[in-house]
From Swiss-Prot:
This is WD repeat-containing protein 89 homolog. The keyword Transcription regulation does not apply. Keywords: Repeat, WD repeat. It comes from the Eukaryota. The keyword Repeat applies. Gene3D superfamilies: YVTN repeat-like/Quinoprotein amine dehydrogenase (2.130.10.10). It holds the Pfam family WD40. WD repeats lie at residues 23-62, 65-104, 106-144, 146-186, 192-232, 294-333. InterPro entries: WD40/YVTN_repeat-like_dom_sf (IPR015943), WD40_repeat_CS (IPR019775), WD40_repeat_dom_sf (IPR036322), WD40_rpt (IPR001680), WDR89 (IPR039328). The gene is wdr89.
């Protein structure tokens, strides 16, 4: 039965140009965003990270030290400490109040992704997954055989922190049980997505599902309990949505899970800076909102602050956009990821506990 749900209806309330006057002409792409209730960290294509005060969007500090592209940033929860990883083969730990780098962690390859579980730092280093203890400043473990190409994302499970998921250009999604001492036993699932994976995220009431976005803009969902595919939304979802809604979809950015409504939201856009917001249901992808009249180029990042009901976006036009959600009521089938898996299509891939290279 159709249920009335609150529609996401984002309206722009502010935007800023990502530049620092004192450093001259340093306007640049914003490659990654990290946000706390009070701070916003924006990593630029000029290898600088700028720290903004969210109350007035003024710049508090500029973090300088990386020598190559900054791929991901993470705040340590409830602190002003920021971690950043880079293609310069380092992770840097920053005091955002002073702007100083307190530690540099050197690795053997480019670091494309990081995630945190207390003192444990997970890194995607080249084709390896490396675990590092921030307290002892020592590497504690590495998985160097689970992937054959660059690891693009590492993510700790939101509830079961002993579980870690990685994805790679090699098309594999690996789930690890870090309580297992033996590396082979620790690899719970090796899933072949048959496509280079660029982004992943958890969803479901117990975060028992995973979404994947490939570098070819393909969306799929997976059951982490079984390692089986739930749904693949088509080889050319962009064209499907463009034809259905009569506007251009050139790329997808990421998905955000709203646990209050149990809904998975997909963000995409066009090359002229218009963003599109979609509801991912068990059977299809439904357009529910637009992000208009702020950006003029590709949108790189979205961050949804559910507590402040604010969406933050960054783009290749050097702008950071701030959007307020003004909900309206629409008649759309509400997604229920806990009860509707039996409605989802077949086309499942079995998980493999054998060699991850058997494709």
């Amino acid at each position: 039965m159709d249920q009335l749900i609150s529609q996401l209806n984002f309206k722009s309330h502010n935007s800023i140009i990502h530049s620092v006057d004192s450093i001259g002409d340093d306007t640049c792409y914003v490659l990654d965003l990290s946000v706390t209730p009070n701070l916003l960290a924006a990593a630029g294509s000029n290898y600088l990270i700028k720290i903004y005060d969210r109350s007035n969007n003024t710049i508090l500090n500029v973090l300088s030290g990386h020598k190559d592209a900054i791929n991901e940033t993470k705040f340590i929860e409830n602190t002003n400490t920021l971690l950043s990883c880079s293609s310069d083969k380092t992770v840097k730990i920053w005091d955002t109040k002073t702007g100083q780098c307190s530690q540099t962690i050197n690795q053997q390859g480019e670091i494309f992704s990081i995630d945190l579980n207390g003192d444990i730092l997970a890194m995607g280093v080249g084709s390896m997954v490396v675990l590092y203890n921030l307290s002892t400043k020592k590497m504690i473990r590495k998985f160097d055989c689970s992937h054959t190409e660059d690891v693009t994302r590492v993510r700790f499970h939101p509830i079961d922190k002993n579980k870690l998921v990685s994805c790679s250009v090699d098309g594999l999604i690996c789930m690890y049980d870090l309580e297992q001492a033996d590396d082979d036993d620790a690899i719970v699932h090796v899933i072949n997505a048959e496509d280079s994976i660029g982004n992943i995220g958890f969803f479901g009431s117990a975060y028992q599902y995973l979404y994947t976005l490939s570098h070819t803009e393909r969306l799929a969902t997976w059951d982490l309990t079984t390692g089986l595919k739930i749904k693949h939304y088509g080889a050319d979802l962009r064209s499907t949505l463009s034809d259905r809604y009569k506007f251009e979809i050139n790329y997808f950015i990421s998905c955000i899970y709203d646990n209050a409504s149990n809904q998975l939201i997909l963000f995409g856009g066009d090359f002229n800076g218009t963003g599109h917001v979609f509801l991912v249901t068990p059977d299809e992808v439904i357009q529910i909102s637009k992000l208009e009249n702020v950006h003029t180029d590709v949108i790189r990042n979205v961050f949804w602050d559910k507590f402040k009901s604010e969406l933050i976006t960054s783009s290749e036009d050097s702008k950071i956009g701030f959007w307020t959600n003004n909900p309206s009521i629409t008649n759309i089938l509400k997604i229920n990821n806990d009860t509707s898996s039996n409605k989802m299509k077949d086309d499942k891939l079995k998980s493999k506990k054998t060699s991850p290279y058997n494709k």
